[in-house]
Structure formats: structure tokens, C-alpha cells
Design a protein with these regions (language model features):
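Residues in soluble alpha-helical coiled-coils and helical-bundle/repeat scaffolds
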Residues: 51-55, 59, 78-81, 122-126, ...
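Structural signal for membrane-spanning alpha-helices in multi-pass inner-membrane proteins
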Residues: 120, 175-178
Length: 206
């Protein structure tokens, strides 16, 4: 019986394998040969869906990492009645994920996939830089707009600058992921999250 072709499933397999490959080896170090082997397809099947490696990288950003930011930050903060409580929950959830995931496959050894792409590819390719800029802007706006709404309802201090606070939180999360993959020590992540948690608590009116 001939095998039924499923283009959507094939494309998804390629993206999943590409995400893992780029996360572990970087975009430039990522191997098309390893991707097709991991996906169980031919190079012809891969290039049927993606014109080249850059297009594949763009798709990973658009279809994997953008939704991840939406899931972790944008959706929880959207119309949040108490943004400080939501930020508490996000930080707690993030630390729990790092503690429970396989270290060699996750943040502890590999860092943040968005940060990895940003550091490696933003200086080299405008398509990557623009997409990454959009991701960071979305992340930043989700925090700053939530804090502004919190100020309007007096659950966030009126004397803080939501834009600056969002910049700080994005920076500490991104920075901890980047430095953390060098230290490869759980204690480092715990310390960074603890500092972020202390700072979040300082946003509550006294």
C-alpha cells in the first residue's frame, strides 16, 4: 500500500528537527544533513518546503519562538488584573521548568533559543534582526502595558517607569539565560530569578 503524503506533517517534522538542531548547535553550526536525518525525510522534501537554510531559520522564529513568547508572557499579562501577581507566577513557572527539564537539552546547557539567535544572527542578517526585534518588542510591550494598567488601578506603584521596568525584566531574563549556559549551574539561575522576584515585589505600592 503506497504511503500517503502529508505535507503539513512533513513540514512540522522539519521545523521541530530544525529547532532542536539550531538550539543545540547554533544556526550557523546547524547541519541540514542532521536535520533531515532527525526528521526522517530527504533533502528534497526539506527544500520543497523551505528554499534555504535562512528561510528555515525564519520559520523557526515565526512558528516556534514567537508563539513561545506569547505563551509565557503576552497571554498571561494580557488584561491582567494584577500584573505583579502574574509576573510572580511567570518567574516561578520559569524556574520550575529549568529545574525539571533535562539539563543537556534545556536552558541550563543551551540557554534561551531567542537570545542565542539574537547574539549569533542579528549582526549578520537583517531578516533575523527584524524578526528578533519584533519578538523582543512584543515581550517588552506585554510587560510595560500590563504595568501601566496596574498603575491605573493602583496595584502598581505610580512612581515607577513601566518602560524602564520592562527593559530591566527582559534584560535580566535574557542575560541570565545567556550567562547561565556558560556557568551551567542551577544555583546561578536560582540567584537570578530571586533577584528578579525581589525587584517585582518592589513594584507593589507600600
Amino acid at each position: 500500500m503506497p504511503r500517503v503524503r502529508d505535507p503539513k506533517r512533513t513540514r512540522r517534522k522539519v521545523l521541530e528537527a530544525s529547532y532542536r538542531e539550531f538550539y543545540r548547535h547554533g544556526f550557523q553550526g546547524g547541519s541540514i544533513n542532521r536535520i533531515v536525518t532527525a526528521a526522517g525525510i530527504t533533502k528534497g522534501a526539506l527544500f520543497h518546503h523551505f528554499a534555504g537554510k535562512n528561510e528555515l531559520g525564519y520559520a523557526v522564529l515565526d512558528e516556534f519562538l514567537t508563539p513561545a513568547v506569547n505563551n509565557w508572557w503576552v497571554e498571561p499579562l494580557h488584561d491582567a488584573g494584577d500584573p505583579v501577581q502574574v509576573l510572580r507566577n511567570i518567574l516561578k513557572r520559569f524556574l520550575k521548568r529549568i529545574e525539571e527539564e533535562d539539563p543537556q537539552a534545556g536552558f541550563l546547557f543551551n540557554g534561551c533559543p531567542i537570545c542565542n539567535f539574537a547574539v549569533e544572527m542579528s549582526p549578520l542578517d537583517e531578516g533575523f534582526r527584524e524578526r528578533l526585534g519584533t519578538i523582543y518588542d512584543t515581550w517588552h510591550c506585554a510587560i510595560s502595558e500590563a504595568l501601566e494598567r496596574g498603575q491605573a488601578t493602583a496595584v502598581v506603584r505610580s512612581d515607577i517607569n513601566p518602560t524602564a521596568e520592562a527593559s530591566f525584566l527582559v534584560s535580566i531574563m535574557a542575560g541570565s539565560a545567556s550567562v547561565g549556559k556558560v556557568t551551567q549551574q542551577m544555583a546561578f539561575f536560582r540567584n537570578c530569578i530571586k533577584v528578579a522576584q525581589i525587584h517585582v515585589e518592589s513594584l507593589v505600592p507600600s
